[in-house]
Structures are given as structure tokens and as C-alpha cells.
């Protein structure tokens, strides 16, 4: 047997054969299956479905037809593959959640966003969508080339004469051999506007196109985060776009909130999304959810997520974004067939390819219409000549034995045409006139004359023929103008695009959140002022500032904390939900957290242990919390100043603490008998004021300390302390340029007058009785700061910062407050403004706000006035300031704004 066929066997190298065969297979998949054409944006199967429906008359204006019949026609005529592959493609073109402009109008079950399969093709019905007609319009006018089908029995178009850039409008996706494409859908109006810009200026920059093409427009809506991925995709053809579903937060009563998801990212399975959320809740990767329901219906998506009491909805939503496909990436690969070859193109290249294709289509259509008009004019000229010579025409026909003889006689005769010569020139007919101004009928003209009805012999019909010739002449002139002028051709192209836009464009569904985003949820967190409270037992909470009512000095306050196990409050400050915080622990480590991540509570709540919020080690607890400016650009000019109870200080660069892992980092080395009192951001031109519990204070410039890079250093001596005394606060003050003598002279001016000067009121220099010029007084008044000192027994006073002389670090300091048994030890020292409010908190959990305008301004060496009436064994343990924004006490509870805590910015 082998010998019998040996003469027909050709030995080949198997390696070479594998290369050739695999390459042929790869190109077949690329060109004939998986990659769309840049011109009409369709793969072969989609193109064949639309053309088959068009050929079968299954138009948008006609009744629906069974999908099985359509699939059968496509498979039998053009696409010899499995019926399921054809039907799946038809179904996708009918899904309004898959295509931005569905090309098939389906009736029946065509699947859902839950991943449900469409009903069998014998149950569903389909027809062309109205917009699909714009893909095949003018296909019968020689606009595109046709190829024979797989068995040579039919012809199919190699491409559809699409009137809009379907590749960009509906997108495409496919995996070929060694390459893949993934093009997102866009808004029709924006894409057509970009095409018009390109038509007007072929040298337009891609960034200029981005002015109208904002980004993809997904049929499922949702939102796009950031523009870097969009810019990369449009500039290079590749990019990653972050998609995020849309959600709303609603109050559902009983202090509970619910997250309502109304839009999900493109191509995300809704049922799987709900299952994933439930799975994450079960695994405790998402906490705080009490109920989860899919309430979606025909009116839209609604995923209802009810939260537990006092849970921060924004934090839960952030966890959902991070753990599920509610936020996902769309990897853009703008790969399409151009000139039969796969190519990754940028936005301008895709638009240019489409516009170039439409130029060819319009040119081919114009040539077709020109030829048709000329053919028609040629016949009408023959009819016009015949009517002008009707008697002779009738005589010839009557004298002829048959039609062929009559036709030959008509063609053999020379006919006078001088009277219609203007019409011949008007339509630019290519007839040949002899020297006598006569011509012969062509076979086409003679045949038309023989087929002419007798009613055409009337004078009115002759006039109508002449009018038709004039109209044809106008059309022919326009066609010739289009072919001769590219400018006119582009005008027509632009006009047709605008008509498509006017008919089918719709508002954008996908919103774009400009700016760069990470996995954080900060931009969804409502900005609100919060009171942060820390207890001795390591509990922390945040309470809305509006929960506390403003009270006058001397009021009894309200219960600010329900005491359990005699826990007392050790620190309180006011900040925004967006305030970044550094947490310093007893072992000298530092942790980082945003304020909104703290547990939300009420004034009577205890909060949560910080050990459950931060990754603390055994026997480690937080001793100090430092709020920072929200704008990190300001961090470049800030340092961190550490102060310990033993009087040590250290100046470090704030940028050293910008990136802190969740498990923290070493901040400062502490001796066993020392503790961290305070940490504050500061600038080089500012001053540091250290204050002790015994009423001493020391002021020195920040610049007198060098920046210590080592985080394990315990710093240098800042203040020399007496026995049993310790530093209780550190304040950052403005730097001053005036001399001590000038400051002392200025302080002789009554404080009421100094405040008036600072407000801009005029003053009489002679009445002040000081040896200073007006400019110096005005400058010092505008720069004056006041230091508030509060004692544990509720006494307080305000003193001018000018009264604290500047010395070198390491000294014993000066008297800050005259303390005694009545006043008790000092618990808080800080700079204040005239319209600030003071917040005090006691060891019993009481909290009171009072306006500082009622606190007396005195010298340093005084005992102050009573700020807070205390019960027996009750002590003030923490002090903070609130910037007041409302004149009335009643409004202050409803409209609190501003923050003036320990942060200097």
C-alpha cells in the first residue's frame, strides 16, 4: 500500500510543518473569528448575523422572527459553525447590559446580569435594532466589496458600511492565538464629536480629543476612578481603568444605616457579587453587616445591605470595594484588524481608520449614484428625442415586422438634437454628435423607446422629462463635485455623523471621578467634625461634635462618658473625619490611622479598646495621639517635636513618619522611668513652650534644636525640672522678632485695647503711653498669641505669649501660673484665640464647653478663675479647644465647624 502511493508522498520536516500549520491556524482565528475589524467594529459572526437579518427583511420596522430561523439562515449561508455559537453572539447583541447600543431587538428571555442563560432559540424572537440599519445603510450601492461564502453559493460583505464608529461605541472583546482585544464601550455622542474634530483637523492631538471623549461609557453605568488609565489607553492603546459600582447610604431607623448598591461595574455578575459579599461576611473579612438582600427588579439594580448599629457605613463600603468585584479593573487593549492585520491602536488611530473608511464608502457610493444618474439621463435623453420626433418614431415602429427590426431601424437613423443640445450638455452625456448635429440611438435608448407607454407622448410628459433631466443634471454636478473635492466629501461625512448623533445619542451613563484613587474610601467619607476621646483603660471613640451643647462658664456640664470599672478619660481632641493621626505608644512605637476608622459612638458610650484597632504588642498601650494636617503637602515643611515627662525633647522630620506599616515603627527610645508627654508638628521659625504641672514654663526656638535622624534617640534635655515636678504639656508658638523691652512695653497696654487694635480699630498713640511707634504696636497686636492654662481643680486663665521670655533650652523656666491647694496642679497649657471654645473633661466622665471670652486675661503669675465647678474627688483630666463659628449658643450645637486643637498648620 505504501509503495502504491509513494509517488504522491512529499517528506517534510515536522518542525517546519508545525510552524506553518500553527501560523495558518493562528491567522485564521485572528482574522476570521476573534478580532474585530476597525472599520465596522464587528467580528465575522456578528457581521454575518446583521447582514443575514438585513437580507431576509428582518428589519426594525417589520415583525419579530424566531431566533432559530435567523440562526439557521446565518449558519446555512455564511457561518458553517455550531448554532450555539451563532445564537450566543445574537443574544449578546440584544443585551442592553452588554452593548451600549444593542444591535438586535430581542423579544423574550435574553439572559440577565445574574448570569442567567437566554431561553432556547426556539422560544425567543429577534429583529434588527433601528441603529443596526446604520451599519448596513448603502450596502446595495457598491460601497463595500463582497466575497463568496464558504461554498460559493452566496456572497457576503467583507465589511459593513458602518455610518458610526461601532468599534468604540459598543466595544469588543476576544481572545485569539497569542493576542487578545478588550475595547470598552463609549458614548455615541462623544465619539462622533471626536470624529468631527478629527475631520476638521487631521493633525489634532490625542489630548484634544480627550476634551470630548471623557472616557468609556458602560451600559451598566457605575463610575470610573481617575483618568490615568483612560489617558494611557487613549494615548497608547493599552491601559487599566478602575470601575466602581455606585452605592448610596440611607438611614433605616434605630440608629442603623444601609448601603444601597444601584449600579455595578461592566460585565460583573450581580448574583456572584451578592454571593461574594455574603462569603466575605461569613469569613469575617467584612464586618458590620446584619442583612443582605437583592431587591433588583425590572426598574433597576438594588442590592440592600443593612448594617449593625453604630457601624460606619463608609468603612464597610470600602471593605466591599476591596474584597469584591464592586470595584474592579477593565484592562484596555485596543487591538483590531487594520488592512487585514491585527494592530494595537490609540484613540486617534481608531478614529482616523474609521474616517478613512467612510471616505471610501462615500466615494464608492457617489460613483455608484453618478453612474446610475448618467444611465438614467441617457435614457431620458433618448425619450426626449423620441417625443420630439414622435411621428417618425411611430412610422418606423409600424413599418417594422418585429421588435428587433424596429430597434435596429431606430438605432440606424440619425436624429436632429439641436433643440435639446443644452440638455445633453447639462447632464454631461457621452453621446457622439456628428458634424451635422445629429446622433444615433444606443441600444439602451432604443429599447426604452420601444417600452415607452403612449401616455408619455403628451406635451406635459415632455416637460416632465426635461425637468427630470435638469434634476439629474444637478445631481450629477454634485456627484462630480464630491469626487473632485475632498473638502466637500468630508462635509458630507460630517453631516451624516451628526444626523446619527441627533437620532441615537443618549446621555452618559458612567460618571468619571477625576483625580487619582487608591483602595481608600476617603473621598466617600462625609467631612464632619468629631470629638475623639481616649480613656486610661485604652478605649477610644469618636463622637460628632454636634452631640455636645455649648454651656456658659461655671455650668455643671453633661454626662460625656458612662463609667465602667472606674475608667477615666486621659485625652480628648477635635478633628475632621479625614484627619490623619499618629499613635505613639508607651514603648516608643508609632502607628498611623485616619480618624474615620475610629469607632463611632455617642457621648455616653465607652468606645473600643485600641488594642482591637491597632496591632499592639503584649503590654503595649497608646500614650499619645497626634492629629496632623490633612494636606500632606504641608508635611514637607513640618518637623515633629517630642517631649517627655522628664524634660527631654527631640526634633525629627515629619516625613520620617509618612509611611508607617500596620504593625507600626519605632519612634523614640524612652528610659524606664520616663514617658512620652506630647508630640507635635512644628516649623523651624516657631517656638516651643514646655509647661510643668508645678506651674513652670520654658520657651525656646525650634531652630535651636538640630533635626535628629535616628528614631531610637531619646533626644536632649529640654527643661531642668525640680524634684517631683514633670512636664505636662508642650505648645507650639509663633516666632517673634521684637525685643524683650518692646514686648514688656507693649504688655502695659490694657488687654482690651490690644484686642481692639488687633481687630483693626484706630488708636491714639499718646493715650497708650508706651514708648513704641504705631507700626510696632499694630504688628505686635496682630501677632499676639494668648496662652490658656487650666488646673485640675477647674481654674484657668489666659496670658499673653509675649510674657514668656525666650531662653535657651535646658533651663528651669519661669512661673506660668501661681498654683496652690485651691487651684491644684496644672493639667493643660495651650495657645487660644478670642472666639475659641474650651472643652474640659473630668475623671468622672463629665464634659463641658465654655466660651473663652469669659475667661480672664491676666499676667503669668496669677491663679486664674473657676472654669468648671467640680464635685468632691472630681478632677479635670483633659483639655481641648473648639473654634466657634456661630454667634448663638443654640446654633452652635447644630452648625459646628472648624478645628483648633493641638495641630499648628
Swiss-Prot record:
The Topo IIA-type catalytic domain, residue ranges: 35-524
InterPro entries: GyrA, GyrA/parC_rep, Gyrase/topoIV_suA_C, Topo_IIA-like_dom_sf, Topo_IIA_A/C_ab, Topo_IIA_A_a_sf, Topo_IIA_dom_A, Type_II_DNA_Topoisomerases
Keyword hit for Secreted: no
Protein family according to the UniProt entry: Belongs to the type II topoisomerase GyrA/ParC subunit family.
Subunit structure: Heterotetramer, composed of two GyrA and two GyrB chains. In the heterotetramer, GyrA contains the active site tyrosine that forms a transient covalent intermediate with DNA, while GyrB binds cofactors and catalyzes ATP hydrolysis.
Additional detail: Few gyrases are as efficient as E.coli at forming negative supercoils. Not all organisms have 2 type II topoisomerases; in organisms with a single type II topoisomerase this enzyme also has to decatenate newly replicated chromosomes.
Protein name: DNA gyrase subunit A
